[in-house]
């Protein structure tokens, strides 16, 4: 369970959390406007419905992070439209130095957040790191369908 940690004149979450907590105050101040203004393309939603079957998702994010503020609400709205069960997603809120007291990030090479990691049968299919290369929907389709995809920090 995430804990609320003082951070200047605000609080941040650290540890495992869920989207319900991120939609509540004070985080709703940044979550709601982006969520309400984003409309996923219906054709992408239909494609993602089948591609998301049996896929597990882990999200590393920061309630203090502007990139998380920009991407997370869109991610939630997209998954809701694709009828993916949000409650099964592992959401991990990190400190400003991108760590957790429980070391959830160990061995996962989390360098930038948000990081969305997609797994099938325990094998990583790919990840979207910090921001989408094309757009969130297109990047997810590429990762989940096995098309060539390099996230923004994959320079190999």
Where are each of the predicted segments found?
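N-terminal leader/targeting and pre-domain segments
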Residues: 1-52
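Non-catalytic, surface beta->alpha helical segment in thiol-disulfide oxidoreductase systems
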Residues: 2-17, 112, 117-156
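Structural alpha/beta surface segment adjacent to cysteine/selenocysteine redox centers
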Residues: 100-112, 119
């Amino acid at each position: 369970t995430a804990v609320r940690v003082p951070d200047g004149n605000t609080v941040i979450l650290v540890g495992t959390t869920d989207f319900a907590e991120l939609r509540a105050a004070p985080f709703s101040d940044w979550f709601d406007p982006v969520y309400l203004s984003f409309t996923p393309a219906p054709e992408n939603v239909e494609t993602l419905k089948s591609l998301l079957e049996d896929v597990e998702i882990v999200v590393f994010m920061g309630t203090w992070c502007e990139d998380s503020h920009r991407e997370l609400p869109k991610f939630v709205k997209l998954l809701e439209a694709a009828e993916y069960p949000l409650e099964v997603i592992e959401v991990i809120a990190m400190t400003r130095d991108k760590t957790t007291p429980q070391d959830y990030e160990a061995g996962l090479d989390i360098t930038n957040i948000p990081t969305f990691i997609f797994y099938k049968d325990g094998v990583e299919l790919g990840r979207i790191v910090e921001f989408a290369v094309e757009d969130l929907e297109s990047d997810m389709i590429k990762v989940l369908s096995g098309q060539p995809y390099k996230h923004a920090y994959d320079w190999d």
